[in-house]
Amino acid sequence: MLTGLFFGSFNPMHIGHLALANYLTEYTPIRQLWFVPSPLNPLKNTQELLPYDLRCELIEQAIRKDIRFQVLRIEELLPSPHYTIRTLRALSMLYPHHRFALLIGADNWQSFDRWKDHHRLMAKYELIIYPRFGYEVNDTTLPTGCRYIHDAPRIEISSTQIRTSILEGKDLRYWLPLPESQDVIASALQSCLSPKR
């Protein structure tokens, strides 16, 4: 059975993440999908990073009734920096009977050659590339083991836009898997942004 690994900040998770996860388990060989939240992303603004436990809890609540999905908090147990190759090696040791596929957006595919040990990633794991607005992927030139899924849903919602809009007091109940989480996210964001003493 092929298990998809969906890495990300999920800061916060939104309906676009779930629509893509649903598509992948229905229209590709992936039968299980594991969300792997990153405790810290060195490429992103950490000032607006919701607490790791809260991000994991929001994902867990959103997927709790769907047996195809689960949350893996493995990166909080691994030393920093959190390179994908290290996490995948750890998962392969913990789950030796699983076949893993790494899910990456077309935006990340453009810079994939700069990822740590990207050749080893491609040699050992299947890569499934999903579309992102503004990024083209020529699937005729993809290496063996890489696949571009043209028809995956593109819901152009970003976690950044959600955070900004929540802080502006906008009602985003239909953008979030759990409409009631908007107040929790707003409170956590205000704590993140308040001056530390």
Swiss-Prot record:
Per the record, the pathway is: Cofactor biosynthesis; NAD(+) biosynthesis; deamido-NAD(+) from nicotinate D-ribonucleotide: step 1/1
Catalytic reaction list:
nicotinate beta-D-ribonucleotide + ATP + H(+) = deamido-NAD(+) + diphosphate
**SUPFAM superfamilies cross-referenced by the UniProt entry:** Nucleotidylyl transferase (SSF52374)
Q: Could you tell me the EC number(s) of this protein?
A: 2.7.7.18
Xref: InterPro entries: Cyt_trans-like, NadD/NMNAT, Rossmann-like_a/b/a_fold
State the source organism's domain of life.
Bacteria
Q: Which Pfam families match?
A: CTP_transf_like
Q: Which UniProt keywords apply?
A: ATP-binding, NAD, Nucleotide-binding, Nucleotidyltransferase, Pyridine nucleotide biosynthesis, Transferase
Instruction: Please give a single GO biological process term from the UniProt record.
Output: NAD biosynthetic process
Coiled-coil-forming residues are none
Identify a single GO molecular function assigned to this protein: nicotinate-nucleotide adenylyltransferase activity
| Protein task | Catalyzes the reversible adenylation of nicotinate mononucleotide (NaMN) to nicotinic acid adenine dinucleotide (NaAD).
Q: State the similarity comment.
A: Belongs to the NadD family.
According to UniProt, the name of this protein is: Probable nicotinate-nucleotide adenylyltransferase
This protein's species is Porphyromonas gingivalis (strain ATCC 33277 / DSM 20709 / CIP 103683 / JCM 12257 / NCTC 11834 / 2561)
Tell me the lineage of the source organism. Bacteria, Pseudomonadati, Bacteroidota, Bacteroidia, Bacteroidales
- Name of the gene encoding the protein in the UniProt record: nadD
